[in-house]
């Protein structure tokens, strides 16, 4: 068995309390600035999602539009015990919709959220000195830069090495273009936790420290989620920020990820005051995740309706390792 290097930091489990989440929504509900951010994101999400969904293959599309793998189809057929083509045909469309959305939803979220919190989305040609960048913000004498990934297992070894090379090679040019001496670079992940990451993100830091002369490293990667170095009088800090850590940093407040969740729910989930009386779940822990037993009978916020509370807990679970009724 291959042993992990001891220098990789061992993260604790990240636990969310439903009571804390509800309190955060109450706090946001009476904050005019936060409410406006949510409403602005809701409008933008709706517009972009509607446009994107319209471009996806629909029931009338021909089979070649779905780019199906015959091997996956047959393995799935065996797993489901299907007998007729009509049975698997019903599963092809939703499966394609999920896979198509997964590749685009992350980028859409970046484009919506970055300007709301004072950042600019970066668009650049492949293999240019800015191709690694997705977001930037000039903050006094600090240039804040970010490369963003949609999930915690998106990287492989080669990508990790390439990102490190891009940072070390281009940091001086980035700084001089904006007349700053300090760069705060983030490898950001839109959801997930440090624990469920495949740790290839941390290897960006290790690869940086292997490229930079030891005397120029002020904070090594060992047992840290960031490192720091200097090059040509430019001071560079590089951090790995996953899930809530990224959103807290982007918005410079601890409720940013809740704001994102509420905006998404408002944009995507039809609001009613009722609950789902017939709900039955297949996933073992889904009932406990989305249970609203902890919600007081008199709990009331204008941003969400009662049927949307389970969605709030459902989304929150994607940013933590455990969610508890406390």
Predicted regions located by residue number:
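Interdomain/boundary linker segments immediately adjacent to catalytic/signaling cores
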Residues: 2-107
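A short, terminal or domain-edge coil/loop segment
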Residues: 85-86, 92, 179-194, 248-253
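Catalytic cores of nucleic-acid endonucleases
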Residues: 150-227
């Amino acid at each position: 068995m291959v042993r992990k290097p001891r220098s990789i930091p061992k993260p604790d489990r990240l636990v969310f309390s439903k009571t804390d989440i509800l309190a955060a929504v109450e706090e946001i509900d009476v904050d005019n600035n936060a409410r406006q951010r949510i409403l602005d994101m809701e409008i933008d999400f709706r517009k972009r999602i509607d446009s994107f969904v319209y471009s996806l293959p629909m029931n009338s599309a021909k089979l070649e539009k779905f780019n199906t793998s015959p091997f996956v189809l047959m393995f799935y057929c065996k797993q489901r015990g299907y007998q007729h083509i009509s049975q698997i045909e019903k599963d092809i469309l939703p499966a394609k919709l999920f896979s198509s959305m997964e590749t685009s939803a992350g980028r859409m979220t970046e484009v919506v959220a970055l300007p709301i919190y004072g950042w600019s989305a970066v668009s650049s040609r492949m293999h240019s000195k800015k191709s690694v960048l997705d977001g930037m913000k000039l903050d006094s004498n600090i240039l804040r830069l970010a490369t963003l990934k949609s999930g915690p297992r998106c990287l492989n070894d080669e990508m990790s090495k390439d990102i490190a090379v891009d940072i070390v090679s281009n940091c001086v040019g980035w700084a001089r273009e904006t007349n700053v001496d300090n760069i705060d670079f983030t490898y950001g992940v839109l959801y997930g936790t440090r624990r469920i990451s495949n740790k290839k993100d941390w290897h960006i830091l290790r690869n940086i420290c292997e490229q930079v002369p030891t005397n120029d490293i002020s904070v090594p990667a060992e047992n840290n989620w960031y490192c720091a170095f200097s090059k040509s009088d430019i001071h560079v800090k590089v951090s790995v920020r996953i899930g809530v850590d990224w959103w807290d940093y982007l918005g410079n407040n601890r409720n940013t990820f809740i704001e994102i969740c509420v905006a998404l729910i408002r944009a995507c989930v039809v609001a009613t005051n009722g609950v789902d009386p017939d709900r039955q779940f297949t996933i073992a822990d889904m009932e406990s995740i989305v249970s609203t037993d902890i919600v007081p009978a008199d709990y009331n916020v204008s941003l969400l309706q009662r049927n949307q509370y389970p969605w709030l807990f459902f989304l929150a679970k994607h940013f933590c390792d455990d969610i508890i009724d406390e």
